Amino acid sequence: GIPLFKGKNVQNGKLVLSFESYIPESVSDELPRSQITKKCLLTPYVGTIGNIAVFDGSFKAHLGSNVGKIELLNSDTQTFILEEYVLWYLKSTYGYAELTKYKKATAQESISIDAIRNVVIAIPPLEEQRRIVAKLEEILPLCERLK
């Protein structure tokens, strides 16, 4: 079967690839909007708001309920925005505030897909995005060890 991403599969900026649920290939073919077949960001929109991770597109999967995908507007031949940059941006204080300013506090926090679409993200030139991602990936593991 085709694995189904649930909110618990997106934790602390990483994907947990142990799946509890799968759907048959025939059902998958009937649900193209929830298919994930290329690199994108995944985020729960109920419960753990702001918990985002990059899906590398290395296998076919599906979105479970309460998990959304963020596909960036890159062309097939040219990259303008790095998924890893958007991940780090949305995990930053400013990016998290931008993402969560639309959340609804009920029994479980939630954010609508339309609200996610309206999040403003500062996008520097591609080379600057690469430098930012590389520096964060170099420094943050050291910071984690110091905790």
Question: What is the predicted role of each segment?
Answer:
Residues 1-6:
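Extended boundary segments
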Residues 8-38, 58:
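Sequence-specific dsDNA recognition surfaces
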Residues 41-43:
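Generic structural signal for buried aliphatic residues
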Residues 45-48, 60-69, 84, 104-123:
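A short glycine-rich beta-alpha junction/loop motif
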Residues 49-56:
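Short, Lys/Arg- and Gly-enriched loop/turn segments at beta-strand edges
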Residues 70, 86, 90, 129-132:
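Interdomain signal-transducing alpha-helices
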Residues 77-84:
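Short, conserved charged micro-motifs
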Residues 96-98, 102, 114-147:
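Amphipathic alpha-helical coiled-coil/heptad-repeat segments
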